[in-house]
Amino acid sequence: MSSEQPAWTFGLFTPDQNKQAPLEMNENAINSLYEAIPLPQDGSSNGQRQEDRQANSFELKRETLVATDPPRPTINLDPRVSIYSGRRPLLSRTNIQGRVYNFLERPTGWKCFVYHFTVFLIVLICLIFSVLSTIQQYNNLATETLFWMEIVLVVFFGAEYVVRLWSAGCRSKYVGVWGRLRFARKPISVIDLIVVVASVIVLCVGSNGQVFATSAIRGIRFLQILRMLHVDRQGGTWRLLGSVVFIHRQELITTLYIGFLGLIFSSYFVYLAEKDAIDSSGEYQFGSYADALWWGVVTVTTIGYGDKVPQTWIGKTIASCFSVFAISFFALPAGILGSGFALKVQQKQRQKHFNRQIPAAASLIQTAWRCYAAENPDSATWKIYIRKQSRNHHLMSPSPKPKKSAMVKKKKIRTERDEGSTDKMLNIPHITYDHVADDRKNDGYSVESYENTVRKPFGFLDPSTGPFIRTSSFTDDLDMEGDTLLTPITHISELKEHHRAAIKVIRRMQYFVAKKKFQQARKPYDVRDVIEQYSQGHLNLMVRIKELQRRLDQSLGKPSLFLSVSDKVKDKGINTIGSRLNRVEDKVTQMDHKLNLITDMLHHLLTNQQGSQSIRTPHRSNSLNSENHPSRNTLPTYEQLNVPRMTQDNIS
């Protein structure tokens, strides 16, 4: 292998030397573990190889499988994970059941919306024709049209019920006969079955030619009303209503209880006041307590039919007072339910916005952990880049394969017929592993394992096994004689330092991308959410400010604690900084006062001493006595006091 060949790639193989695949790293050094397959440099060798393969087409049909994918870009991924593969996904019975079940029971997308909306329109049109059949002017036309529409709807809903029952087998709890019975016991399934069976009975028994009997038309109208329940098969509206009522059950019970008490009392007092009153026609308006209750229900619900009206002024006064009180309580449940629905919708929007953050947060956590785990060279995080060797799938088998079954041969011929035209458009034939269905008996592969293999993400360091050929012919062995295969990594020790460095760089980039996506998912989605976020932030800020103020008051102290006259209040703030500073100021003031007093005394004594020295006494005895017994009031002068201190300062 020349030094210009790429030593290794991230699971990609580039047949064109001028175009390099993304995430490809080139090295000049020869790597024994990763060697690229040398490709022919001119077109003549390609044509010669193509002619040789066409000459041995019969033998290749028996022993090899040549991939004939449609034209695709120069990047050739592994055939199991190639996004350019022309193979259609395998359709099985379980797969079809799941798709039909999701289409009918879990509608998502515009196709499901169009189907279910069309069914709703058909049911609504049938109901409109049923209403028109009650009008004398449109009776004949509506009845005849309704007859044929009922036949079509019965056949359609019957077939749909059977399909729903069959498709429910894709779920584990509806598998088998007992599972189907469990599915048929669902309330909406029971309603569908009743509508279908009753419609068939009405069409068979209650019709004469193309005309319905009167009783049959009544039954058809009732069944058409039941068909409207078919629109909401999931019961989302009923669940939403039930959740709102359950959340606000306490408020609803309170208002209904008080309103019911007001209804009973108002009806009873009006009955006592109006039981003997006679109206203009000579009849009793409130002849019984039941008439009074009917009047109360009509009044407090703000319907007001006017069939029962109080006649006396006492009854009118009682009715006015109780109506204002009772009507207000009977109107409260509507407001409670309305606010509950609004809060429920807002909660669903927030939950939907929060659900968008879960994948972004999980991706961020995963990428952060992988960046952390990549720092350890012996970590198990490197195992995802290692490909396990297949035990039963050998390349270049020396022994010929046994004969395939007739079904496998037909499938191979059909695949070659569908994709044979695309093989001529390729300059280099892409040869892959045998199809999974061809090696099912020998290699033990299944459709489920194939689908799981396709879904499994491959590491970008897995070298592409490239276009391989499985053959035992001597001619093809000569063709592949000079080719060198890329050896897959089978152990962590085979990962080089540049491999690990590239993995760390890519993981760090994935971390930054996941972080950006998570920050975008965390952004508020509504103005109300922004306002709530700001109000929550303001509340947190005020809480922190109050906590800081409390700590400052605890450390510094409030002025009212240490400036108060009461000793009990002073004791509360004795350990605060303010109290200590206040005590220091008091001590400084006392010291200043004492120093002023001492200064005045010294000045007074100095004045007295100077006056006593000016008067000289002639008696020596007095002078001797004064020398031997100095006066207690005699103090040193200011200069005498300063001289030792100045001397001490000079010494220091």
Curated annotation (Swiss-Prot):
List the SUPFAM superfamilies. Answer: Voltage-gated potassium channels
Binding annotation for a 1,2-diacyl-sn-glycero-3-phospho-(1D-myo-inositol-4,5-bisphosphate): 234
Q: What is its main location?
A: membrane
Does the UniProt entry include the keyword Chloroplast?
A: no
User: Which key words are in the record?
Assistant: Calmodulin-binding, Cell membrane, Cytoplasmic vesicle, Endoplasmic reticulum, Ion channel, Ion transport, Membrane, Potassium, Potassium channel, Potassium transport, Transmembrane, Transmembrane helix, Transport, Voltage-gated channel
Region Interaction with KCNE3: what ranges?
A: 228-236
* Ways its activity is controlled: PIP2 molecule is essential to activate KCNQ channels by inducing the coupling of the voltage-sensing domain (VSD) and the pore-forming domain (PD). Upon channel activation, PIP2 disrupts the VSD-calmodulin/CALM interactions, causing the release of CALM from the VSD which triggers the opening of the gate. Calcium potentiates KCNQ1 channel current through calcium-bound CALM. Calcium-bound CALM competes with PIP2 to stabilize the channel open state.
Q: Which residues lie within the membrane without crossing it?
A: 290-310
What is the recorded membrane topology of this protein?
A: Multi-pass membrane protein
Residue ranges annotated as compositionally biased, kind Basic residues, are 401-414
Q: Which domain of life is it from?
A: Eukaryota
Region of interest called C-terminal assembly domain (tetramerization), as start-end residue ranges on this chain: 578-609
Q: Tell me which parts of the chain lie in the Extracellular compartment.
A: 133-143, 209-216, 274-289, 311-312
Q: What is known of its domains?
A: Each channel subunit contains six transmembrane segments (S1-S6) with S1-S4 forming one voltage sensing domain (VSD) and S5-S6 contributing to form one quarter of an interlocking pore-forming domain (PD). The segment S6 is involved in the inhibition of voltage-gated potassium channel activity by KCNE4.
Record-given protein name: Potassium voltage-gated channel subfamily KQT member 1
